[in-house]
Amino acid sequence: VDASNAAPDLTKLRTARFKLPSRYSARPSDLAWIVDGGTYAKFLGMTEFLTMEKAGPLATAQTGQIGYVDGAPVLVSAEMALTEADGKVGGGTNDRGTALCVYRPGWFVGYRRRIAVSVDYLPYTDSYQLTATVRLAFAPFDTSVASLLYNVAV
């Protein structure tokens, strides 16, 4: 959904939310909004955005949740870059925000490679180094578990 270079508001967010199939969009507790830092700053200006002092202790540093919009938790991703007006990261200005609405049960996390542990002796410090690695996979259940609000003015 194109926000037309305007600040996010509840109408635009609901339009993006209801682009999801009704079996996904009907339960806000199963949804989450993932936003970039600039879009989060605009969310703070929305009267409909419930911050934790209003919404209670459900969002903590452990979950990363910073508030609610329309009953769905909001998460800020430092890895989500600003985009061009078309919602894609390009070589140009990249000065627009995005808000991604996801149906949380519609995503799978699995192992590409199980946990591998190695112990190495470091003679120069007379100590041991323990290293554990894992490769995870992340995939959607189907092609309709996410909806994007792009071209958000930040």
Give the location of each predicted region.
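Extended oligomerization regions of viral-like shell subunits
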Residues: V1-P123, V134
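Protruding loop/beta-arch "assembly-hinge" segments enriched in small, turn-prone residues
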Residues: S118-V154
